[in-house]
Amino acid sequence: MSPPSVYLPVLQTGRWFAHLPPDFAQPLIAMAQLRHLATGEVLFRRGDAPCGLYAVVRGAVSISGTRGRADEARAALLIRLEPPHWFGEISVFDNSARTHDAQATEPTTLVHIPHERVQHWLQAHPQHWHGLALLMTDKLRSAFVAMEELALLPAPQRLARRLVMMAEGYGQWTAEGQSRRVIEISQEQLSLMLAISRQTTNQILKDLESRQLVRVQRGEVEILDLAGLRGVCA
C-alpha cells in the first residue's frame, strides 16, 4: 500500500497546506494514513464522534445535512469537496460530534489524520493551533458570503456564482488564476446545493447554455466562458 506521502504533490496544490511551516506540515503527513471510499460510502454522519482531519486527494466527498422526520426529511447539499480540500477541523477544535454528513460521490482516496493523534500532537505543540485555525476561518468567510448571497441574490446569479467558485476550487488552489473547465456535478446536486428547485436549475442552465457560457452534459457542466459567467454574477 502506498504511503500518504505519495500524495504530497496533490496536497501542495492547496493554498492552506502549501503555506504551512515545515514543522507542522511534515508531522501531519507522518501521522497520516490513507482511507479509501467506494461510491456512496459514508465517511461519517451528523452526531458521530470526532474521527480526525481529512484531505481529499482523489475523487470527491459531499458534505450535506437533513432536517425533519425520516418520511419527510429535507436534504441540503452544502458543498462537494475535491482535491486538495481539507475538512474535519471543527471537531478537532471543540472535540464535539460531527455537524453534517460526509459521503463519497465517486471512488475516493483521503489522507486521514486520526483524531487522537492530531489532538495529542497539537497539545504538545500548541503554537500550531493557529495554523489549523486558518483553515477554519477561511471556510467561515466563505460561509458568510454564501449566506449573504442566499439572502440577496436571485437564483440565476447564485447559480452562476457557485459555478465560478467551483471552477476556481473555492479559492483553495495555490496557482493564481487557476481554474478548470469541467465541473462534475449533476443538476440535482446543484439544486440541492443552492436550495432551488430542479426545474429552476434546469431553466437557468439552459439560459446560460443559450448564451454559450456553459455546456450541460449528464453529470457535469462544462465552462465555456468563465469571464462571461463572472459577468452574470455581478
Cite the ranges covered by each PLM segment.
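ATP/adenylate-binding site constellation spanning eukaryotic-like Ser/Thr protein kinases
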Residues: 22, 58, 83, 107, ...
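A generic structural signal for short hydrophobic patches within well-formed alpha-helices
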Residues: 25, 118-119, 229
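Hydrophobic residues on short alpha-helical segments
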Residues: 160-164
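Cyclic nucleotide-binding regulatory module and flanking cytosolic helices
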Residues: 1-42, 68, 91-92
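Short aromatic/basic micro-patch
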Residues: 53, 80, 112, 184, ...
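Cyclic nucleotide-binding regulatory domains
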Residues: 16, 41-106
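Phosphate-/nucleic-acid-contacting segments
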Residues: 155, 166-234
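Cyclic-nucleotide recognition modules
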Residues: 77-137, 141
